[in-house]
Amino acid sequence: MSLNFLEFEKPIAELEAKVEALREISRRGDENALDLEKEIKQLEDKCLELKKKTFSDLGAWEVAQLARHPERPYVLDYIEHMFTEFDELAGDRAFADDKALVGGIARLDGRPVMVIGHQKGRGTKEKVIRNFGMPKPEGYRKAKRLMQMAERFNMPVITFIDTAGAYPGVGAEERGQSEAIAMNLKIMSELSVPVICNVVGEGGSGGALAIGVGDYVNMLQYSTYSVISPEGCASILWRDSDKAPQAAEAMGLVAPRLKELELIDTIIDEPLGGAHRDHKATAENIKQRLLEQLKELDAFDNEALLERRYQRLMSYGYC
């Protein structure tokens, strides 16, 4: 169970702490300890009801915090729980290997696929190595190389999006960050194999979109997808990052709103309390949806698949 509770989860944390304390007393088996099973059960039921109530009415700002939860599963966690025979491929064959973006060949239910996704890292050392999940141009060029390889070998491409955005450093700009992102948009719109994109945490701006063009775009229940962070939006509009909660509500960055606007296709349920509560269950939910969608896309020949993707992209926006 997660030890990191968000501010709005504090009442839940207090109840869970009480339950754990009573369990510890019960486990010790002290001669004077009362039979606590009934009290533990009552507290567990109360905690469950509180969770259901809390998570049934989350605002956009609370969802944004869940999307960034430090124990939320990342692409390597999904690879572990969903795929077999994963073989990571490194480098863009031009400059370097970007650890913020992971990719390689794996099997999904026995079927060869190309898996690509952002990896934020856990702990200070890994976060620095992974650049906090913010790819540089070489990361996106690595993704392009892997997607083109997938097309040559007729393998579907599956992406996992979870980034605050593309790295905005001077070196990244000098090496063509915007060109790398733009090229990926072009490549992904032209791939002759099925492409399924999954927003599993933060979907931040062009850094997310660079691996986000596909035949299906799915979002986890408590993920976000937007052109800027709520804090960034608040700083620009109101010169006050403390107004991030108001910005989050106005931006429409949550899955239900994006589904309503037909910018995404599917909302995938998370376990009660969020994906960080149960990595395996979350991965299983995504896996089942991927298998269903791949089966649907297999019915299209290359020409029909590209036409379907083109029509999907051209449907975006208002006329």
Curated annotation (Swiss-Prot):
Signal peptide range: none
Top class in the EC scheme: transferase
Domain of life of the native organism: Bacteria
EC number: 2.1.3.15
Domain CoA carboxyltransferase C-terminal: residue ranges: 35-296
Biological process terms in GO annotation: fatty acid biosynthetic process; malonyl-CoA biosynthetic process
TM spans (from-to): none
Annotated catalysed reactions: N(6)-carboxybiotinyl-L-lysyl-[protein] + acetyl-CoA = N(6)-biotinyl-L-lysyl-[protein] + malonyl-CoA
Pfam families: ACCA
GO cellular component terms, semicolon-separated: acetyl-CoA carboxylase complex
SUPFAM superfamilies, per database record: ClpP/crotonase (SSF52096)
Family: Belongs to the AccA family.
Annotated NCBIfam families: accA, AccA_sub, PRK05724.1
Function: Component of the acetyl coenzyme A carboxylase (ACC) complex. First, biotin carboxylase catalyzes the carboxylation of biotin on its carrier protein (BCCP) and then the CO(2) group is transferred by the carboxyltransferase to acetyl-CoA to form malonyl-CoA.
HAMAP family noted in UniProt: AcetylCoA_CT_alpha (MF_00823)
Subunit architecture: Acetyl-CoA carboxylase is a heterohexamer composed of biotin carboxyl carrier protein (AccB), biotin carboxylase (AccC) and two subunits each of ACCase subunit alpha (AccA) and ACCase subunit beta (AccD).
Protein name (database record): Acetyl-coenzyme A carboxylase carboxyl transferase subunit alpha
Protein's organism: Aliivibrio fischeri (strain MJ11)
